[in-house]
Amino acid sequence: MNQNLPEPNQKKWIPDGFHFLGPEDSKYRRTLLETISGVLKKKGYSEVFLPAFDYSSTFIQTVSAPDSSSLFRIRDLSGNEISPSIDLTVQAVKGMAGFSHQRENQNIFYIGRVFRESTKGSVARKEILQIGAESIGVSGKENTFKILEELDEIISLLPLENKLTLVLGNVNLFQSIVQEFELKQNEIEILSKLLYQKNVNEIQKIFGEKKNHTDLIRLLSSLVLNFDLNSLKNSLNINSLSKNLQKSLSSILEETYWIFNSWESKKRRIDLCIDFSLLRDLNYYTGFVFQGYLQDSPDPVLTGGTYDHLYEMFSGVQKNASGYALMVNTLESSLKTPLFNLSS
């Protein structure tokens, strides 16, 4: 007798966190994807197709500890531990680092799924469709601004119900501060997590009694809920710091000023705000980082930034890189009306 027959509920239902789209919803999704990919092709990006699985170690060495704990893991017949993708940026950069692709177009885009195990119960989505773009060989303030303009053009084509606000930070501000105070790696990990959560009280509790950490706490507290650049500069009191730290912080703030002022110079569909406590995946982000949020939605609808060391991890050759990903599922649920194929 076959002992592997599905339970009655398994015959009827799809596992929690996964979804089936019928013909009509699939048609609307296809139109949404073609609308976004049309902009990317016009901007000079070439499409690539990513593998569904990769070695688990590929993700573990690049993403943060909380993210790596949500990996689905299996062993293939050769004994290798493999996982469905939890980070498509990692796979895109890893793929392009292959020797045979180094002379091809280094501006690429992809459509793919990420899979994350969740402890939030049946309401949590475990499968997320993304469309993303990567530029290998370039980064910096000008390229970050170009990316933001691309995103604004994409969003302007979508009938979104709510306004999109993009939060811009730069992990180098935090890195410069913790390097100045010679913090240990475990302390940096704790601080980055608490800053991202905007938990100043816990930072003061942990580091308040440590010798010479008064300035550290003041600087880190300045990064929390301080969205105005001039106010942030005053709170940091840069002139009171060492020459090296003054130089580092001033340079980062000047680049951020440039992006913000350039953005505000004309009308945009996306609102831009500054938040230097936006500290994501310090294992590979190396400069500007951003997340986009729709009003009344707690989860980001887009993420991106600069990762100048990621390519080197897979090729041994240093190349700057930057990019972004849009969460298609969140976009779909935020449209006033479905996108219709204008050519039909």
Curated annotation (Swiss-Prot):
> Which cysteine pairs are joined by S-S bonds?
none
Supply the alphabetized keyword list: Amino-acid biosynthesis, Cytoplasm, Histidine biosynthesis
Taken from the record, one Pfam family name reads tRNA-synt_His
Q: One GO biological process from the UniProt record? A: L-histidine biosynthetic process
Could you name the Gene Ontology cellular component terms for this entry? cytoplasm
Is Hydrolase tagged as a keyword?
Answer: no
Gene3D superfamilies per record: Bira Bifunctional Protein, Domain 2
NCBIfam families under this entry?
PRK12292.3-2
Q: What is this protein called?
A: ATP phosphoribosyltransferase regulatory subunit
